[in-house]
UniProtKB/Swiss-Prot annotation:
Annotated catalytic residues: C190 (thioimide intermediate), D197 (proton donor)
Subcellular location: Cytoplasm
Protein residues bound to substrate: I88, E89, S90, H229, E230
GO cellular component, one term: cytoplasm
Name used for this protein in its record: NADPH-dependent 7-cyano-7-deazaguanine reductase
Gene that this sequence comes from: queF
Keyword tags: Cytoplasm, NADP, Oxidoreductase, Queuosine biosynthesis
Pathway this chain belongs to: tRNA modification; tRNA-queuosine biosynthesis
Reactions catalysed: 7-aminomethyl-7-carbaguanine + 2 NADP(+) = 7-cyano-7-deazaguanine + 2 NADPH + 3 H(+)
Family, per entry: Belongs to the GTP cyclohydrolase I family. QueF type 2 subfamily.
NCBIfam families on file: QueF (TIGR03138)
Amino acid sequence: MSSYENHQALDGLTLGKSTDYRDNYDVSLLQGVPRSLNRDPLGLTADNLPFHGADIWTLYELSWLNSQGLPQVAVGHVELDYTSVNLIESKSFKLYLNSFNQTRFDTWETVRQTLERDLRACAQGNVSVRLHRLDELEGQPVAHFHGACIDDQDISIDNYQFTTDYLQHAVSGEKQVEETLVSHLLKSNCLITHQPDWGSIQIQYRGRKIDREKLLRYLVSFRHHNEFHEQCVERIFNDILRFCQPETLSIYARYTRRGGLDINPWRSNTDFVPATGRLARQ
């Protein structure tokens, strides 16, 4: 359970409540969640963040009417900057996108600009939006995370409660290594509804070698943990940086789709360019 799970800032969210679906444009449906909710307990403030990054969203269920009333469909790519005051709550994002369904827009660019303007206002930060026609995406191969997968270990696990204990004394030797580790066993739960969130995670670092068994046990300990995707990624970054003290660190997670949206946050303190291809479970 997160320390801020019952925070008053979450009281007004539609998440976890019965809601009506609207099919005419309504920007009021968008809701933000302050990033400070999870950053404050981690000792992170806007002027001392140890990372840069973004939350990458893929919008698979985006449709509207053109000026003649003919339905249009697109796949959207949204990048929400890590410096924004708020993250975007995903159910409200879905409801907001549904409100485009019976709304007429003159051009695709008008749709893109509308999305960008509204998301920036809700997040109180920088947002970029791209729209793709379906034929631009057809035939794209399923991507994979580059790196060594740490999942196939012959170990017994019986603790699924979140703890950073596994990261204590998780590095060994004085030699500096540079490696990329991958796990597909990341599972946490929605902060509000406690529905499961499934993800794959890529951890790229340079520093003293991290024990792979301890790292995997740490990741598995998220299994009963309740936080949003973005918050989990920042927690993982902060914990590894604190306990393992790598010189450079990049964390990138790609989560499975829900409600026509997938969320793929990344955080890094070095040069890092996230690959945006969908993984096998996306």
